[in-house]
């Protein structure tokens, strides 16, 4: 007879936290400096005028203005921020 009791154990039960990637501000929306526009893996969306690119490829606004998306290539888009005064 066994003297040790069988102990059930699961090798599953781990999960990574979500990365919350995607478009955060859409075309035409008003943004302030530092506003995150896109969180992404790699440069699926390219940075244009008046935006910065973080080391994790996050695109953020550098000025006050409106978000503008344009086609960059067949598979990529480009995002820029147009100054609010220039729009009016």
UniProtKB/Swiss-Prot annotation:
Keywords: Ribonucleoprotein, Ribosomal protein
GO molecular function (one): structural constituent of ribosome
Xref: InterPro entries: Ribosomal_bL27
GO terms under biological process: translation
Stretches for region Disordered: 1-22
PANTHER family according to UniProt: LARGE RIBOSOMAL SUBUNIT PROTEIN BL27M, RIBOSOMAL PROTEIN L27
Family, as annotated: Belongs to the bacterial ribosomal protein bL27 family.
HAMAP family recorded: Ribosomal_bL27 (MF_00539)
Protein name according to UniProt: Large ribosomal subunit protein bL27
């Amino acid at each position: 007879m066994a003297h040790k009791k069988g102990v059930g154990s699961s090798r599953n039960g781990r999960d990574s936290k979500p990365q919350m990637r995607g478009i955060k501000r859409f075309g035409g929306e008003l943004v302030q400096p530092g506003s995150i526009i896109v969180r992404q893996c790699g440069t699926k969306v390219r940075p244009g005028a008046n935006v910065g690119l973080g080391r994790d490829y996050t695109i953020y606004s550098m000025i006050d203005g409106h978000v503008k998306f344009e086609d960059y290539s067949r598979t990529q888009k480009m995002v820029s921020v147009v100054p609010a005064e220039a729009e009016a």
